[in-house]
């Protein structure tokens, strides 16, 4: 293999040539990665990295199911407004963490960042268990959110760049849908730990937050063997390392190197200048940026507004005690997980544009319908939960597709930051405002007021469906470099 100082045109690893006087590499690594069959390597990568969504599901569910315990805690004694504020602090941390860590992920590499972000999450969620008042609780939730937000950018980027093209849609949807496995874990944990015959209220909620820290330690060990993204390495001046990793992946898949894989020429660079990032996001790719923003904002408001406050709806409107709320999240979580699993393959076969439009539109219509049944008071706690289960069967696939869209329709050099920007803006618009707004609506005690909030969420989803139908990119089964040409690519 040629070293970085080899003469122009020398070989820089199997399937690529490096012209180091101009720092140009001709490589077939992206095409080789996309041509692979699914293997144990891909399963291990998806498991070790995708577990981030399980952690987020655990955290968000605990925030919801523990709300009653936090109100009853002799130490904290939170109001509904306090709970809404703390939920918004978590989301605000996720927004800022996504932007900061997203920029670092594109600059320093995927692997470094998914250890840094996981470490922050571990420390912050453990610290949450030691909270002594609203300020400390909100601060630790903010830091936990920052770790999770950073995880989203680093992990989404890595998975997109490692998974073969024909599996990308379904894999991404299932990984995002695994959020709800974490939600189920959180619900069951809350059922056990909030049982006052077993533990006091003030001890139970603290132990619940330690579950995330323990799970995070296991994940940390699982990630130690995962390599850096070969795509990132090639562009950032490490073609030899990229070639070696690609060869190892092919060997683990027991698949010979593709003999006629398409090659692309890339001008290697240490980093992408910020002006080029901004120019690409809001110049060359401004239409895709608009689509990403609309999809992310709509699903964030729809999801976070309802999910962060569902426990309050059950306790305040249906009289469910806080120690029984966890049982109601289980069918809700099942619908949310099954949606991406059962609908996910259609995003690769029928196509992104049709399926994103359908899932967003159906979600909006179903929420409006179930909201009407809520306002006329014909639902019980059980039928309300079943209605949410049906609504979010489609909404979960829609939300997962929003992450899929922003992670595959922008160039490799800005992929993590693009995910971060649209996650941050979308969550800032839809997620931070949503829980606080719905918390205030629930505090009014008026079904009519809460129904207006549901209608707002439904309207946002229908608007997003219209935008998707008009502007979504047909990225199904296509290589990432064909969906969005790398900024470093030359003819």
Residue ranges and their predicted role:
Residues 2-491:
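Transmembrane-helix signature of 12-pass secondary carriers
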């Amino acid at each position: 293999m040629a070293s970085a100082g080899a003469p122009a045109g020398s070989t820089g690893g199997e399937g690529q040539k490096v012209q180091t006087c101009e720092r140009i590499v001709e490589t077939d690594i992206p095409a080789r990665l996309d041509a692979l069959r699914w293997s144990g390597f891909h399963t291990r990568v998806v498991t070790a990295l995708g577990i981030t969504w399980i952690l987020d599901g655990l955290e968000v569910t605990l925030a919801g199911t523990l709300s009653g315990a936090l109100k009853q805690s002799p130490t904290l004694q939170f109001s509904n407004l306090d709970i809404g504020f703390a939920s918004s602090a978590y989301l605000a941390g996720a927004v800022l963490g996504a932007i900061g860590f997203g920029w670092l992920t594109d600059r320093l590499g995927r692997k470094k960042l998914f250890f840094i972000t996981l470490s922050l999450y571990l420390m912050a969620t453990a610290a949450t268990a030691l909270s002594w008042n609203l300020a400390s609780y909100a601060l630790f939730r903010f830091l936990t959110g920052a770790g999770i937000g950073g995880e989203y950018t680093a992990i989404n980027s890595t998975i997109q760049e490692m998974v073969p093209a024909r599996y990308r849609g379904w894999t991404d949807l299932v990984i995002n849908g695994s959020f709800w496995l974490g939600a189920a874990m959180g619900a069951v944990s809350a059922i056990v730990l909030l049982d006052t015959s077993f533990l006091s209220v003030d001890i139970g909620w603290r132990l619940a937050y330690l579950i995330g820290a323990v799970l995070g330690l296991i994940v940390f060990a699982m990630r130690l063997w995962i390599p850096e993204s070969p795509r990132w390495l090639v562009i950032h001046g490490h073609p030899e390392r990229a070639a070696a990793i690609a060869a190892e992946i092919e060997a683990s898949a027991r698949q010979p190197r593709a003999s006629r894989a398409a090659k692309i020429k890339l001008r290697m660079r240490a980093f992408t200048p910020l002006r080029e990032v901004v120019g690409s996001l809001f110049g060359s790719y401004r239409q895709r940026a608009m689509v990403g923003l609309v999809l992310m904002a709509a699903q964030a408001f729809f999801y976070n507004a309802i999910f962060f406050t569902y426990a309050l709806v059950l306790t305040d409107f249906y009289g469910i005690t806080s120690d029984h709320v966890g049982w109601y999240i289980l069918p809700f979580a099942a619908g949310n997980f099954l949606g991406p699993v059962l609908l996910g393959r259609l995003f690769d076969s029928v196509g992104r544009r049709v399926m994103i439009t359908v899932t967003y539109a159906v979600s909006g219509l179903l929420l409006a319908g179930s909201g009407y049944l809520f306002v006329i008071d014909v639902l019980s706690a059980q039928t309300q939960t079943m209605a949410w289960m049906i609504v979010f069967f489609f909404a979960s696939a829609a939300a997962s597709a929003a992450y899929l869209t922003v992670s595959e329709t922008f160039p490799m050099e800005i992929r993590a930051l693009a995910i971060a920007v649209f996650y941050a803006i979308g969550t800032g618009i839809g997620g931070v405002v949503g829980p606080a707004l719905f918390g205030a609506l629930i505090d009014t005690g008026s079904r009519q007021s809460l129904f207006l909030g549901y209608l707002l969420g439904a309207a946002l989803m229908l608007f997003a469906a219209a935008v998707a139908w008009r502007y979504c990119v047909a990225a199904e089964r296509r290589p990432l470099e064909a969906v969005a040409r790398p900024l470093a690519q030359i003819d």
